[in-house]
Amino acid sequence: MARVTIEDCLKNVPSRFALVHMAALRVRQLREGADLLIKPSKNEDAVIALREIAANRIVLKNKSDKKG
């Protein structure tokens, strides 16, 4: 994937707001040392997070999905 676009990400996320939230959480995880879910690159953490979302490597979980 040469360039990641918002439209690529929105195919896997229900809204732009959810996309921003997911990307921000993933950037935090990456900065704390989480493993990459895509091929390593020299991109910034935000771009890596968006690429992972566009590649459908990250999924949005609903609060109602939690058991307990």
UniProtKB/Swiss-Prot annotation:
The keyword Transferase applies. Keywords: DNA-directed RNA polymerase, Nucleotidyltransferase, Transcription, Transferase. Its EC number is 2.7.7.6. One of its GO terms (molecular function) is DNA binding. Belongs to the RNA polymerase subunit omega family. The RNAP catalytic core consists of 2 alpha, 1 beta, 1 beta' and 1 omega subunit. When a sigma factor is associated with the core the holoenzyme is formed, which can initiate transcription. Promotes RNA polymerase assembly. Latches the N- and C-terminal regions of the beta' subunit thereby facilitating its interaction with the beta and alpha subunits. This is DNA-directed RNA polymerase subunit omega. It comes from Desulforapulum autotrophicum (strain ATCC 43914 / DSM 3382 / VKM B-1955 / HRM2) (Desulfobacterium autotrophicum).
